[in-house]
Amino acid sequence: MKKENLVSVPFMVLGIVFCVCLVAANLLETKVVQLGPVAVTAGLIVFPVSYIINDCIAEVWGFRKARLIIWMGFLMNFFVVALGQLAIAIPAAPFWQGEEAFDFVFGMAPRIAAASLTAFLVGSFINAYVMSRMKVASQGRHFSARAILSTVAGESADSLIFFPLAFGGLMPVNELVKMMVVQVVLKTAYEVVILPVTIRVVNYIKRVDDSDVYDEHISYNVLKIKEI
């Protein structure tokens, strides 16, 4: 069996954290918070971590492993949303006072989840694709620039899809556009601030896992999940 087809402990750990971040972000997106003069969704707290992990996986193990984790994250998010809807459908105990709050969070989830999952798939695959192609083109150099540029590409696509689908008709267009721009800027800034840690993590995993995949002559078809 080829080494790149094996699943290592670092890969599993990053995959688990990736899925947890996505599920948490999907629920946190139901709240809009105020940061000084701008409004952003609370998902900003954790969602950028998924892009950082995406960068790490694409850099160390290549696009095929990133593709697998992206689809796993999608399925975990879908599973949590489905469970939430099931919980809403089951009648609450007569003495329980929290049904309204519970329904608000998970009742909004279907629309936000649909927007989030669609945006997540497009943005994450763009991020992984750009990271993969730039690594081959640069012969593995300039990781910092590749990580930032791939994040800008992925986050821009994510925000352009998510906000109109999730909040269209619920707030003024100018506020929607402002939120989209602010989210991309803040998420990219998040990546830049964490970049020194990301570089150390990537270098450590490459050394420990003895893996540094270059995606030459592979298929970028997002549906070829079996090719790992």
Enumerate the language-model features and the residues they cover.
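Hydrophobic transmembrane alpha-helices
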Residues: M1-F74, F78
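Short aromatic-rich membrane-water interface segments that cap or initiate transmembrane helices
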Residues: T41, I45, A101-A115, V182-Q183
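Alpha-helical transmembrane segments and their lipid-water interface positions
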Residues: E29, V33, V80-I88, G123, ...
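Short, highly charged, low-complexity non-transmembrane loops/tails of multi-pass membrane proteins
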Residues: V202-I228
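Pore-lining and gate-forming transmembrane alpha-helices of multi-pass membrane transport proteins
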Residues: S150, K178-E191
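Internal alpha-helical transmembrane segments of multi-pass membrane proteins
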Residues: A137-S156
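Interfacial helix-loop-helix junctions of multi-pass membrane proteins
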Residues: P164-N174
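Membrane-interface interhelical connector segments
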Residues: L86-A109
